[in-house]
């Protein structure tokens, strides 16, 4: 009503206003008429004067008078009109007054209605409040029901426990009885032992007496023998003398006989004495031996009894412990019984609540209070139990506990979960107790522990059991997000620098199908291990292990411990990393024969964001070096679906301003999750081979994308760049581990598919990439702004759905969706002298779709073959270009821009679109092909260097045209150009995402030179995409070409090899940077 009345008022007021306006107009007209009348009157007066003056001319005057009369009549008629108008005005005034009164009444009505509305609103609010209260009450009721269910289940569990406790009590009683009987036996044994001891002591004393008596007898016998022998000798002498004196004449024979007889008698006597003495001695010796044996027996018995006494003491202590346990169990039982009663009361009350007998809120509050009380009680009981368990712990148990704690700490390092740590310690403690105690005691302690676990304050029984039974989720699944933060936390160890890799390598965990089962437990170590185990195994040990393929495993083992250190080390000055990279590069050259050692260097280089800056500097320095190094592409492929790990390493001398684009870029393409890092190598070392090796290393880092995209992508991309730049390029010869000593073109590296090992850990990379990749890249981009030598580092993750088909015909429609996220960091080359250097570092996050140049179809060249792809490629890329140096050869503007673009489109250009969708391998091949167009494949890497397309882009799924486009226009269209490219930067309005640009546009902008290359590259890249399900390219490329697209052609050669991987929106390296 109020609205209707207000509407009526407004309508009536409008009508009145309209009438007023018309009346005012009439009034104005009447006023004009009155003025005219006054003028006529004045004229009449004048005429009258004239008539008076000119009486003579009456006739004429009369005629005039007639005319005047007519005019007066007319004027009078007008006066009537004026009167009528005045009447109308009066009426209008009256009507207006009436309308005003009406409006006042309506206002009052409106106010009344508003008051009523306010009242109704209050009622509604009250109603909604009551509704909310009702819903809350319903929820609380449901909660209470759930609680009752839980409590009933807990009751059942408690009943079971009570039964277990009762059984344990029975067992304890039995053990007590057995112990008591054993004690009695021991007591009787001890009594018998004591009596035996007394008896034995008495025997010993008697034996001693006997021994003394025997010794005395022996001494007496000895004396008697001596006396007897003396007497016999005297008698003989006397007899001889007598015989001699009586008859010296007696025949000598008789005397001899007598002497012989006497002698025989003497001998017999002596022998008799000796035998008697010997008999006595033997008897005494035997007795002594017997006594000694008895003494030894007694001693052994005493020892046995002492050991029995100790056992008795132990048994007594155990008995006391068991009694304590029994008491604690009784207390627990009482607590449980009380809890059961409370729970029963709660259940009754809840039933009453459900029946509506008790008011809902009061019941809810009271039940809540009770629930909390039970919780506290549970805590108290748990505390008491813990006391008993502590008492039970023997030193051995404590030792076990310490061991468990260490173990738990180790687990925490890897799993980051407290639960995981606690559960093993519980189980170990229990096991230790069980081993040390008798079976009965073991069961008792287990019971107490169970109860303890049950009442652990933090968790209910079930939770405790879960924690015990299940390793933490982190331990069960590969650490993804965690690894990120962890890796950064890690201490910096040069050896550990694999930690950085670890991040990158998270995805690369599956790398080599090597032992990654262990990887999941080590969030950091995983990636490191995976990367280490992959052909890049050495990288974990960076400089140390480069020489040995076997080191991969070592790196994997050390990767976990080192991963953390590696991250920290990565933060070390990039100069450190660079020097290490150089070393690694040298080592890698030796190792090139071993495909496994290829990657190692790259991953080993720890670079943090700071390192990124250093890497950028390194890039600039490498450019300065002026060593044109062929780009080496290392592809490790264990299976088409396995992560392709391709590294395209391009080294170029920095000295050439145009060839700055040739900066060594390690482009790593992992078909699945591998991030391709293309980094112009910061290492000043001229050796292209070593750089290539190092670059190949970058691959493991690419894995970072999986989990670390948000936080880690930027850092990791930087790391990978550093690692790749520092690491020597490991050239992959075609399928053969060609020695790194010989520089390889990216095409050659691409050819060496055999070397490619799966770096990817199969993770749902698409999800990761699709959802957060762009944002993460944006976040990561921030650090990229660090000033550094001109470097473009791009981390591109491309997930081709089909990695199985190594190469897809450019015309083939790719059915897979390609999503790629790339972080591209372009550090302005601090050297302004290089004309082609991009002065602004920028990080590009490019989705593979962008990379695939899903340009707006309108813009795309109408390439049918790409359109053939049924699936639309969606690409999101965010590009942050922060110019570290405003000064750039190519007038790359320092302004930093963050550009994000998404394009959904089916590539329309045949050649370009094909290239766009081409997988990493195709991209590599395309690079080769492009190079082949420009140069023989072997020359490609060199050409790339020479072309100064240091920003040697990897496009796994990007059109070369797009890449080229990006160089000249990519950023222009897809993104606003951060800085105006020296010649190329289009207006910001033209900065549509390159994805929107047609490949042809990109190519044309870049340079026509790249077009054929891009087509070939796309064809290859398409097949590559199919092969590599997901390729993550972590490309750190310094776009040294700030050159106009015309300059780009040289770069295009790089893009051919490198761009393919680069997915280079970056491609526009210089131009792109300028545009961006």
UniProtKB/Swiss-Prot annotation:
Changing residue 891 to A has the effect of: Does not affect localization to the centrosome or midbody during mitosis
Q: Does the keyword Hydrolase apply?
A: no
| Keywords for this protein | Acetylation, Actin-binding, Cell junction, Cell projection, Centromere, Chromosome, Coiled coil, Cytoplasm, Cytoskeleton, Microtubule, Nucleus, Phosphoprotein, Tight junction
The record's GO CC annotations read:
actin cytoskeleton; actin filament; bicellular tight junction; centrosome; CERF complex; chromosome, centromeric region; ciliary basal body; cytoplasm
- How changing residue 573 to A affects the protein? Does not affect localization to the centrosome or midbody during mitosis
Region Disordered: list its residue ranges.
Answer: 246-291, 358-546, 569-600, 675-746, 770-819, 862-913, 929-998, 1042-1076
Q: Which residues form a coiled coil?
A: 11-359
Top-level taxon of the source organism = Eukaryota
Nucleus recorded as keyword: yes
Where are stretches of biased composition, namely Low complexity? 569-578, 793-806
Region (Required for interaction with FLNA) residue spans: 833-883
Composition bias, kind Basic residues: at what positions? 368-378
Residues modified to Phosphoserine? 255, 394, 425, 440, 512, 570, 574, 611, 659, 690, 745, 905, 932, 995, 1042
Job description of the protein: F-actin cross-linking protein. Stabilizes actin and acts as a negative regulator of primary cilium formation. Positively regulates the phosphorylation of both myosin II and protein phosphatase 1 regulatory subunit PPP1R12A/MYPT1 and promotes the assembly of myosin II stacks within actin stress fibers. Inhibits the phosphorylation of myosin light chain MYL9 by DAPK3 and suppresses the constriction velocity of the contractile ring during cytokinesis.
Q: Assembly and partners?
A: Component of the CERF-1 ISWI chromatin remodeling complex (also called the CECR2-containing remodeling factor (CERF) complex) at least composed of CECR2 and SMARCA1. Component of the CERF-5 ISWI chromatin remodeling complex at least composed of CECR2 and SMARCA5/SNF2H. LUZP1 is detected as part of the CERF-1 and CERF-5 complexes in embryonic stem (ES) cells where it is involved in complex stabilization but is not detected in the complexes in the testis. Interacts (via C-terminus) with LIMA1/EPLIN; both proteins restrict ciliation and may work together to regulate this process.
Q: What is this protein called?
A: Leucine zipper protein 1
Q: Which gene encodes it?
A: LUZP1
